[in-house]
Amino acid sequence: MENTSTNGEPARAEKSIGRLHVLTDFHLQQDRSHAELARLAIRGGADTIQFRQKHGGIQNKLLEARKVATVCADASTPLLIDDHLDIAQATDADGVHLGQDDFPIDAARSVLGPSPIIGGTASKPHEAAEAYEQGADYIGFGPVFPTTSKRNPKSVKGPDGLADACEAVPIPVIAIGGITHDRVRSVLEAGAHGVAVLSAVDTARNPEQATARFRAAIDGVLREADS
């Protein structure tokens, strides 16, 4: 018999969502490949890798994503593909992350089925709620702080805006945008499940150490909360 939620709809299976998402990018820096960034981030404690490549042809994206998929599979670390359902399927990734202007979440769920992780992007609480209703497993919310990784970032939301988004949905919210080691505590205390980082790791002199500092900051806050 199919499990149902309180509103009579099929119950959504809870999935394990990581707390430290590292996005790999070859646009902000060209010193390290996606695969190398993924390897270093995982060694530093990242529990989710998100392949993000906004530029270039589909064949090049697929080639790079396959290399990252190998790294993640060897380390038993979940891999999410930014934007591209086709690449996610071709690489047997664990899921996708979809922006506001990407493939609709409900359509993606129909294509991918119930098992893969689908993350949705939101910059307002009502957008987070809409993504949840469409079938998202987690919300990437931001920018929480000023960020240089996007040319025209939407208005900064701050910890208070993040808290509103966390209250709007019953699924994990991942804070993104200008996240630094020193800001981890404020976003977790606002209700975020975890953080997603890009330039703070990808452009760091030592991505592994940068990731490890994020891991330590997250774990430290969680330990305090449990004590």
From Swiss-Prot:
2-[(2R,5Z)-2-carboxy-4-methylthiazol-5(2H)-ylidene]ethyl phosphate binds at T147, T148, S149, G178, L198, S199. Pathway: Cofactor biosynthesis; thiamine diphosphate biosynthesis; thiamine phosphate from 4-amino-2-methyl-5-diphosphomethylpyrimidine and 4-methyl-5-(2-phosphoethyl)-thiazole: step 1/1. 4-amino-2-methyl-5-(diphosphooxymethyl)pyrimidine binds at Q50, F51, R52, Q53, K54, D82, T121, K150. Signal peptide: none annotated. Binds 1 Mg(2+) ion per subunit. NCBIfam families: thiE. Belongs to the thiamine-phosphate synthase family. This is Thiamine-phosphate synthase.
